[in-house]
Structure formats: structure tokens, C-alpha cells
């Protein structure tokens, strides 16, 4: 039996940070280099910089106008205008021109009453040195411009240049080697085959290294061979100031990172009490950090963001940039284990003056949860989580300005939401759409609790076979809410090309096929349960009934990958994935909205998108939709 790794530690997040700060000192980690001032943006000064020249280096005119001798203008006032002659009484100057003897004041061109090429008339005297910039007024020779250990900004470059500085000493940017490992890892999407994984992690980490001010050295993936990995690691260590090895940090039989790091130095800790990201490894070879990041992208991101990035900033002699936090109210419960500090990706938006926070998929391999996230909620290790409605504080991962002008949507999923999001961004980006998929009933409850602006729904009234309108009066006060018409769409079974299981309808679900379901509360799940009840089919007889996905695309992906034979969804999801589709019938996909939102500019933008020709064109390309006055508002009071 192959030997498996074990985690040596379950170090708390706080202890992990302290261990790293104690193990590495910034003064020992990087050298110093001299570079041109104009190349120094975002670099860190290694020594103080003092001005060689004064700025301005001569008495200079601060305005366009005329230079005069102040004493010769004393006779001018409102009743006794004074005429001056070019040469003896004044000379023309532009902003920045030297003011030399005998001139000692400047009168702005706007204050001249009459002027020709050789004469001007003034109505008030000039004070000595009026509108004249003195030598060293901005920067004096010998004055400190920037201290050491300062991240250099654009204004610093301007000031140094004005002070006669052409070069300065900065800390050398640490070079961070990034070594992806895994036999399944490939770089070229054209060589993709079953079981292969594109090397996206090293690209993400290289960008994060750049963002932290360091220089990435991205290496080619190495297969799961202990000797080859060690050889590649040795080369990476020789060429860099720090090495990141990706994957191979957990407890698998082919996880070689810990052994490799131990071969070249010492392991400081292996295992951190965080979720996701527990398998992380940190070690050192001399003063060089050696880092093993988990292969799951979210796990790797969390460890890099919270532990590696501060370490790279330490190596450059700078503190971590200030982070922006915001408080908000959770739209649903977020449980957590007492064993870890948990980092939960969240989406948010302002509804009725409150920030509503919705947790996203918490899987360690869900890269898109990072893309969609507006922030990170950190749950302390000793906490069991938070109940729905709890006011919490979270860290923003995108600018607040992008969040505050959003239309918040909670409810059913459809690909048309992606189309609307793109159209709203094309509108100038003034308004966006923040969409969280919690199913139609999730949207109904969110509207009732004031947690969203709109709720996409497609809920069947089993008594009359109509969609959505019955919600008004049953769940909503008709005078407070309205319905925005969306689209008709075709629901049916998504199956593999050629329908190899011969699925024709719900009667075949309890046969020898594996099903993939939508989550409870979704309109698609409600439809399936209604059809099963009509046919008298026990859900327990369906293999996969309790295996749930939150979107139509996730259902289609499961069928395409072979982990399921069929799932109920919309035609467009099947078409996009090249799958076959067994139609069951049409339904109505609409939007519930509070009436007090109807005049809101962001909602008007949303409605305009629904009514647009571009929206109709894009849905025509997807297929499976019928448009009958999308954007029409129906009131039930």
C-alpha cells in the first residue's frame, strides 16, 4: 500500500500568521537595486530621497500677464488709471517665465483694462512679489521628498523629477517561482481530453503575485513523479526568492509537496485551521519561503490572499494595504464548524437602505464563486455560524461603487439573466445586476422579507395550471407588489446526445438511469414533483432524486460529464452544452417586484433591456424561448 501524507499541524490562522512574521524579516529577504525614477511606480524606496534642485529654481511668474516694478504702480487706483509702457514700465510674461531684476511683481492679464502691443492701463497697484513663485517655493534643495520604505506613487515620481532626481534605490522585487504539479495538468486547451485539467491555478497565482508587487516566474507543469518534481523544484529555488508548488499538499498517495519542501529546507507548518485551505504548507530554505498551495482553486486563493500576500509584502518592506469592510444582513443561515476559521464568499447589494448579503457556493473547487463574489465573510474558529437576518461584517473584494448601484435579484435561475447582466453593463456600467440563485420560492421569501429588488419566478399553480399570478394574494399584498412579464420557455429532460437511455417522460425516471435534480424550492423542482404526483411515482424510486443542483447549467454539465443520465431543465441549457432535449411543455418565467421600486432608474434599465431588440436577438440564438411583451408590468390591485 502506498504511504499517505498526514497533516502535521492544525495551526490556527492567527498562529500561522505569527509563525511567518517571526520566521522572515524583510531586511534579509531582498536586495537593493538602483532604477530610473520614471520606472519606480509602486516600487518601495530602500533609502530616503532628498531634492538636488529647488523647484522652481528661479523666481517665476505664477500667472500670464505683465511683470512690473511694484513701486512704479503705486499711483494707480479706481479713479486714476495708470498707463505703463513696454520696456520701461512692464514686460509681457507667461506662467513659469523667470522674474529677474528690476521686475518684482506680476499683474494678471485679466486685470489689464486696455492694452495694445506697447501700452497697458492698470487700475490698482501691484504688491511686491505679487503672483511670483519664489525659488524653492515647492521643493527646496536638500528637502526630504520621500522616506525609505515608501511605496512610490505617481505624485512621488513627479516630485522627485522636479527635485532633480533621476535614479533612486528600491528594494528588489522578490521573484516568486510558481510550479504546478499533477499528471492531469495541461496548458493547451486544444489537447484537452477526459481526465485532463487546464492549468488555470498558476495563471491566477501569477496575477496575484503581480498584484502583491512581486515578479512571478511561472514554470511548466510537472507530472506526479517524485524525482521530476524535486528536480523542477531545485531549479525553481535557484532562480527565485520564493517558491510556490501547487497541489500535492493534501493526504493523497501522490501528494509530494511536503516531502519536496522538506528535502530543500524545513517545514514551518503543514495544515492550517481554515476552510477552505487546510492542507497548506509553509517552509523555508534559508531566507526563502517555500509554499505548498492546495490544488483546489478556492483553497489556494484563500491561502494566498490571507497568508502568502502579506508575506510578499513583508519581503518588500511594506505593510498590507488597507481593506474595506462593510456591514450587512444575511439573507440565509450560514452554519460553520468549530474546527476552522471559515472564509465564505458572498454577494451583496443595497435594498431599502440595507445591505443584503447572500452566501455563495462554499465548495473549495468552485472558481466561479470567486468571480461572482463581492466580498468574503470570515467566520471565527470558535463560532458555529450565523442565523438568517444576522447583521455581520464582511470584507469587500470589489469596489463599493460597483455594488451600491446594483439591482439585487434573488430567485430562479435562467441563462437570460446573464444576457440582461451583459446588456446592463453595456448601458455604461451605471447599473448592474446581482443575481443569486435560490429557487423561485427563495425569491418569493426574499421579496417578502425586503431582501431583494426583483425575484425571478416560474411557479406552477397545480390547481389551474397557470404560472406565477396566483402568488399575488397568497404570498404578497397585491397593493405592494407587481409582476414584470418575462418570457415563455420550454422545460424538458436534458439527456446525452442520441438519448441512449431512451427517456420519453417521467414514467422512465424510476428505471435504470441516474437522475440529477434541482434544489427544493425551485420552480423546476415544483414542476417535477407535480408531474410525479400526477403519475403516482415515488421520488425514492428515482436514483439521484436527492442529488441537487442550483442552476440549469449545472444540471446540463452533470449530464454532459456522465455523472447523470438526465435532468429536468430548460432547452437553452441543453443547446449550449450540445445535449439532446425531450420537451415536456412551456412555462412562464417572470419577475416579482415591489411597487415602490417601479420608478427606480436601475429597474427602468432592467425593463428597457427586457424590451430591447438585442435581448430578443440573444434569446433567439439560445433557443427555447417565446417573447410576448417582455417588460410589461401587471398590477393585481
Where are these regions (language model features)?
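Ligand-binding cleft/hinge of the Venus flytrap
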Residues: 419-429, 507, 518, 524-547
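Periplasmic-binding protein-like
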Residues: 478-490, 579-608, 631
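Flexible glycine/proline-rich
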Residues: 14-17, 32-37, 42, 47, ...
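N-terminal segment of the mature folded domain
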Residues: 425-505
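Phosphate-interaction motifs
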Residues: 2-167, 326-330, 379, 391
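A ligand-binding cleft/hinge motif common to bilobed small-molecule-binding domains
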Residues: 456-474, 556-585
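Short loop->beta-strand "edge-of-pocket" segments that line small-molecule binding or catalytic clefts
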Residues: 404-413, 506-526
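Phosphate-binding glycine-rich loops and their immediate beta-loop-alpha structural context
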Residues: 134-245, 405-424, 430-431, 435
Amino acid at each position: 500500500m502506498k504511504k499517505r501524507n498526514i497533516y502535521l499541524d492544525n495551526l490556527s490562522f492567527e498562529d500561522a500568521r505569527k509563525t511567518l512574521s517571526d520566521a522572515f524579516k524583510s531586511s534579509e529577504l531582498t536586495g537593493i537595486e538602483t532604477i530610473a525614477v520614471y520606472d519606480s511606480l509602486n516600487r518601495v524606496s530602500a533609502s530616503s530621497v532628498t531634492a538636488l534642485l529647488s523647484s522652481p529654481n528661479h523666481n517665476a511668474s505664477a500667472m500670464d500677464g505683465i511683470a512690473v516694478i511694484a513701486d512704479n504702480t503705486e499711483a494707480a487706483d479706481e479713479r486714476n488709471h495708470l498707463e505703463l509702457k513696454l520696456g520701461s514700465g512692464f514686460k509681457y510674461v507667461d506662467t513659469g517665465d523667470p522674474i529677474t531684476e528690476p521686475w518684482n511683481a506680476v499683474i494678471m492679464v485679466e486685470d489689464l483694462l486696455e492694452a495694445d502691443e506697447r501700452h497697458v492701463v492698470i487700475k490698482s497697484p501691484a504688491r511686491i512679489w505679487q503672483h511670483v513663485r519664489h525659488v524653492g517655493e515647492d521643493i527646496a534643495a536638500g528637502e526630504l521628498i520621500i522616506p525609505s520604505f515608501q511605496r512610490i506613487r505617481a505624485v512621488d515620481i513627479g516630485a522627485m523629477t522636479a527635485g532633480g532626481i533621476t535614479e533612486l534605490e528600491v528594494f528588489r522585487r522578490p521573484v516568486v517561482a510558481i510550479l504546478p504539479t499533477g499528471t492531469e495538468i495541461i496548458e493547451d486547451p486544444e489537447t484537452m481530453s477526459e481526465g485532463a485539467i487546464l492549468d488555470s491555478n498558476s495563471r491566477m497565482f501569477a496575477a496575484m503575485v503581480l498584484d502583491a508587487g512581486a515578479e512571478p516566474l511561472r514554470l511548466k507543469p510537472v507530472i506526479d513523479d517524485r524525482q521530476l518534481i524535486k528536480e523542477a523544484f531545485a531549479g525553481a529555488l535557484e532562480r527565485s526568492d520564493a517558491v510556490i508548488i501547487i497541489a500535492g499538499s493534501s493526504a493523497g498517495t501522490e501528494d509530494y509537496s511536503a516531502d519536496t519542501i522538506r528535502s530543500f529546507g524545513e517545514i514551518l507548518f503543514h495544515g492550517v485551521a481554515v476552510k477552505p485551505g487546510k492542507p497548506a504548507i509553509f517552509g523555508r530554505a534559508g531566507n526563502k519561503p517555500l509554499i505548498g498551495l492546495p490544488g483546489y482553486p478556492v483553497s489556494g486563493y484563500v491561502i494566498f490572499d490571507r497568508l502568502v500576500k502579506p508575506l510578499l509584502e513583508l519581503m518588500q518592506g511594506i505593510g498590507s494595504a488597507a481593506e474595506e469592510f462593510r456591514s450587512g444582513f444575511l439573507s440565509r443561515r450560514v452554519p460553520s464548524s468549530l474546527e476552522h476559521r471559515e472564509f465564505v464568499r458572498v454577494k451583496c447589494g443595497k435594498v431599502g437602505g440595507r445591505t443584503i448579503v447572500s452566501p455563495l457556493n462554499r465548495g473549495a473547487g468552485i472558481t466561479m464563486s470567486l468571480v461572482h463574489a463581492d466580498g468574503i465573510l470570515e467566520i471565527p474558529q470558535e463560532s458555529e455560524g450565523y442565523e438568517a437576518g444576522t447583521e455581520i461584517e464582511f470584507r469587500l473584494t470589489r469596489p463599493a461603487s460597483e455594488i451600491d448601484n446594483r439591482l439585487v435579484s434573488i430567485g430562479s435561475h435562467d441563462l437570460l439573466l446573464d444576457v440582461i447582466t451583459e446588456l446592463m453593463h453595456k448601458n455604461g456600467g451605471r447599473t448592474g445586476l446581482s443575481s443569486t440563485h435560490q429557487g423561485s420560492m427563495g425569491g418569493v421569501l426574499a421579496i417578502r422579507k425586503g431582501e431583494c429588488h426583483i425575484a425571478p419566478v416560474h411557479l406552477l399553480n397545480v390547481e389551474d395550471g397557470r404560472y406565477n399570478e396566483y402568488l399575488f394574494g397568497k404570498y404578497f399584498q397585491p397593493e405592494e407588489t407587481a409582476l414584470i412579464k418575462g418570457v415563455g420557455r420550454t422545460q424538458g429532460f436534458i439527456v446525452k446526445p442520441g438519448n441512449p437511455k431512451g427517456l420519453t417522460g417521467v414514467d422512465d425516471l424510476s428505471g435504470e438511469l441516474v437522475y440529477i435534480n434541482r434544489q427544493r424550492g425551485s420552480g423546476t423542482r415544483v414542476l417535477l414533483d407535480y408531474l410525479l404526483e400526477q403519475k403516482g411515482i415515488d421520488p425514492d424510486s428515482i436514483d439521484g432524486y436527492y442529488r441537487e443542483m442550483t442552476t440549469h447549467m449545472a444540471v446540463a454539465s452533470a449530464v454532459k460529464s456522465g455523472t447523470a443520465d438526465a435532468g429536468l431543465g430548460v432547452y437553452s441549457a441543453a443547446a449550449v452544452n450540445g445535449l439532446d432535449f425531450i420537451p415536456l411543455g412551456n412555462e412562464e418565467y417572470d419577475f416579482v417586484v415591489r411597487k415602490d421600486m417601479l420608478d427606480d432608474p436601475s429597474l427602468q434599465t432592467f425593463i428597457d433591456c427586457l424590451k430591447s431588440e438585442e435581448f430578443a436577438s440573444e434569446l433567439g440564438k439560445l433557443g427555447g424561448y417565446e417573447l410576448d411583451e417582455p417588460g410589461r408590468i401587471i398590477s393585481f390591485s
